[in-house]
Structure formats: structure tokens, C-alpha cells
Design a protein with these regions (language model features):
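Non-catalytic interface/targeting segments
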Residues: 1-56, 63, 88, 93-137
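Mid-chain, well-packed structural core segment of small domains
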Residues: 59-92
Length: 137
């Protein structure tokens, strides 16, 4: 499962989604986690209500199931959720490695319902039909 982190320093969740310089992306499973990429953003990143800066960030995280942020605006959160990504706001800057370790431990046990749903993001839905349903007798 891919997880995205809004960060200014690549080691902590410490950035507002809209003005994050970097989105760090990791793959996490019950067996471990692996750094995949850091997507850098330049240009105007001020917290100014300019929604145009969100497009490239949403594109960068489109395959992620969860996004960790220090803060996120209402419209940004709505766009993240509409992309089937679960945003999580940290109360204070937190080390990405610490979050990954906690997430890995939860995945190894019994994940809460919201996390089980997030884990299904990239899984194709299995559709099965009983033979009886296919008969139009």
C-alpha cells in the first residue's frame, strides 16, 4: 500500500498539503516499508487559496491510499477524499519513520475498518455470480 507524506525536510510530516515542498511516497506492508520516491514542488506554494497548485500534488499521490499532512484546507481535503485517498492530519510534526513503523505494526494485526478500506484502493473488486443468478428461468 502506498502512503504519501507532506514534508519540508523529507524526514517529518511537517507541511501543509498545499505548500509542501516535497511529497515523500513509501510502500508499506506488514513485512516492512520501502521508500519509493520524493516528488519535489517548486514555484508559488503560498497558502493563498490558489487551488491550481493542488493539481500536480494530487497527480503525484493518485496511487496512494493514505496522505499524512500537518494541515490541509477544506477544498484540498475534499479533492484528496474524492480521489479515494484517506487524509490524516498529525497534531505536531512527527517522524515519517515512526509513522511507518506504527502503520506496519497495525497492518500486521487487525487494522481498523477505515484502514482496511484504504488497503483495498488498488485491488480490483472481485465480482462473483451464483449460477442461479445467471439463469433467467
Amino acid at each position: 500500500m502506498k502512503i504519501a507524506f507532506a514534508t519540508q525536510d523529507r524526514t517529518h510530516v511537517n507541511a501543509h498539503f498545499g505548500w509542501a515542498k516535497t511529497i515523500a511516497i513509501y510502500d508499506v506492508s506488514p513485512r516492512g516499508h520501502q521508500f519509493l520516491e520524493a516528488v519535489e514542488f517548486n514555484g508559488e506554494l503560498a497558502e493563498d487559496g490558489n487551488e491550481d497548485k493542488l493539481g500536480p500534488k494530487l497527480e503525484a499521490i493518485k496511487d496512494c491510499a493514505i496522505l499524512y499532512v500537518a494541515a490541509i484546507g477544506g477544498s484540498g481535503a475534499a479533492r484528496v477524499v474524492s480521489s479515494n485517498i484517506h487524509p490524516i492530519k498529525v497534531n505536531e510534526p512527527e517522524a515519517i519513520d515512526t509513522i511507518l513503523d506504527k502503520l506496519q505494526a497495525v497492518l500486521g494485526g487487525t487494522p481498523p475498518p477505515w484502514l482496511r478500506k484504504a488497503m483495498l484502493k488498488d485491488k480490483p473488486r472481485a465480482v462473483s455470480f451464483d449460477d442461479e443468478q445467471l439463469q433467467h428461468g
